[in-house]
């Protein structure tokens, strides 16, 4: 029996464009914040890393909090759309603040300014916006194929935006003057673009009525869960923990790739290569995303596709290490592209996997916590990205790197090589290991069989994939 379709092509594109706004924040922050702070503002990489790590302690609480708030929200716009729409206003303001540290401030005041603006951006506004955006996957359609398509559209926009930001920002900043004020100007422009696109995205989709989401019956207040109860439901779901772990590892990987700006500048002696490597990463990802929905259908699920993709990614990153020690930039780019091609399918279908994870909680616990379930996206992105950026700072500080110096010691150059060549390979191996155990689709099929639920009835009956 063919599943009911809920979305037009423009709904899918409109939804996907929301990650343009998300990556205006995320790609800009993770790729360039550290180099701005160390080389333009003159702050110590190790201290910045420590402040970021401390900020992450706050994030774990806010992810579960906002997920729980979305589950409790009832408005004319729906459950998630208000949080997505209004949360980005704060994102835009605090993004500018992160790149607008007053040069007249003393060192301590500069650290304080950064810590406050960074914590508000990640722990409050980006959290509210990103969890709501991700939760829409479960709230605007009950069709499993459409959910995979939404994920593909979303990450095509995400990686296209990441590609553009990584490719043009260095030159853009130089054209604006190359100093701290230039970074502020670029941040303002990016924030405005993100705000406009996020608004368009939020208004391009409509959440399904609660009557339809809940099998014709609106949940009463007794079905609302407190944050503590929602947290308990999450940790009982082993697949949620796996997805969180994978997200964190992905963002650690991304932070090391972002640290490539140091590797290109000091080891390869050409900072403009950072933009060229961005093409080698993002174009294959986009190509893989285009074919992900077809491959999911061909292989009758996401598990085999994701695992095989990451086997390819590990091979690609291992060859990048070899090419790096050979000193061959063309080979490094080619193998970087191979690794990215393997990573693409998981990027495209992860939201559908999370929907299956939410279904697993419903089947095992009899309770639905869609908004809170999608906290793993924001939690993983922020904790992984934040810790990754912090680790970059700590490792640079440990190696003796000083951003304002004209030359760097050999220990710093060796550390940059380790961060850019070896750590991404290690993280890919760990992700492959986790994905080998993330067969939530089969687990759900077994549970449905035990409960006597027909496979073709589940989407409509359970509101999830």
Region spans (language model):
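Membrane-embedded alpha-helical bundles of multi-pass transporters/translocases
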Residues: 2-465
